[in-house]
Each structure stands twice: as C-alpha cells, then as structure tokens.
Amino acid sequence: MAKRVLIKFSGEALANEDGHGINSKTLKYIASEIKPLVDSGVEVGLVVGGGNIIRGVNASKEGIIRRSSGDYMGMLATVINAVALQEALEYFGLTARVQSAIEMNEICEPFIVRRAMRHLEKGRIVIFAAGTGNPFFTTDTAATLRAVEIGANMIIKATKVDGVYDKDPHKYPDAKKLDRLTYDEALQDNIKVMDDTAIALAKDNALPIIVCNMFEEGNLYDIIVNNNLEKCSIVTDKKENE
C-alpha cells in the first residue's frame, strides 16, 4: 500500500518579502519539493492557508466586517493560493486537482472524499481549498480533517522552523526543541503546534502530526520516504520511550 500524506503549508509561506501576495519562486520551490515524493509513489494531499492575502480574524477586528464574513473571505484566499500551487505543480509535469469545500465549478472541483481518494490512487496531487467550508475553523483544522477523511498516514505541518519549541525560537535564544511530545502536551498553552481543535481531532484518530522546516531542501522527502525523523518534531499518542 502506498504511503499517503497530507502536507499543510501556511499562506504566509507563499508571500513576497513584504508579507503579501504570492512569490513565484516559493511556488516553484514547493513544487520542486513535492515532485520527488510523487515520483517515488507517495500519494500527496495538500492544504494551503490564505494569510498572505487575508485573515478572517484580522479582517473583522475593527468590527466593520463580521467574523463569519471575514472567515469566508479567508476561505476564498485559500482557493487563490491553491490554484497558484496547482499551476506550479503542473509546471513540473505533475497532475494536480483543486477541491474546494465551497463550490465554484468554473475554477475547481467540489470536495468529494471518494473522488479525492481516487485521484490520489491514480498518482494525482489533491489540493484541498476553502478550509472546512465553515467559518470559525482554521486551515490547520481543515488540514487535519482532510487528512483523517482520506486516510493519510500522517499530517505534516511545513513551517519556517525545524519543529516544535517550548517557546518562540525567533524571540528566545534559549528555546528548547521538543523532538517528541504527546497530543496532551501539544495542547498546552505555551506550545504552539496547531490550534486545539486540530490537535484534538488528530488525537481522536491517532493521526501523527509532524512539524518540520519546509525551507530545508529535501526535508520532506527525507521525512516521508526515508523515514528520517531527526529534523522534525512528532506529536503522537505516546513518547518514544514509553
């Protein structure tokens, strides 16, 4: 049976240096990192956030835009990013499908789990867009939900750091990397892995969460294909020494 993974990228990772828009070089880099996975037989699902375009929380903080409307705007932003990512993957000769939780048939397919799984079985990449289709849920939760639905072996949160730390390593030089932790430990307030809903969903379904640095070339291949887990953090139901 082929290994099936769900990889979550933040929208900010796609942004230009000013934090906005879509950086074509980053798109190209991500696609170049995904291609070896597909070529080796890994079935790949992707979720990308929309923070480089708009965040629902930020859009609604002045009180003019309702939070629910802000979240829908954020969902539309993820569709924009998903289509951009689809183009980059196809540039590398890969076959990719965008499935949206909100129907927009002229742009992408609606999310249908059986169709998504069939695409994966045929070696196509599926990019899941528009979150869960509901406001008040993050793209981390959407990614975890899709990972569970498609029967992924793991969910990988590809970030700008090489794992989970006890505090922000960009602010605190003495931050300690946590190589292995349980779901309950990941739910602690000072440990930022994903939001609580996403972690609880992963826990209920025994879905391993892997946090790694997306900007280290070959890292995804090393983790997924070579099973090299030294350069990441893993969240599971128990620690390695238990």
From Swiss-Prot:
Q: What is its EC number?
A: 2.7.4.22
The protein's location, in the record's own words, is: Cytoplasm
Instruction: Tell me which GO cellular component terms the UniProt record holds.
Output: cytosol
User: Per the record, what are the reactions this protein catalyses?
Assistant: UMP + ATP = UDP + ADP
| Protein name from the UniProt record | Uridylate kinase
* Enzyme class, spelled out: transferase
Source organism: Nitratiruptor sp. (strain SB155-2)
Carries keyword DNA-binding? no
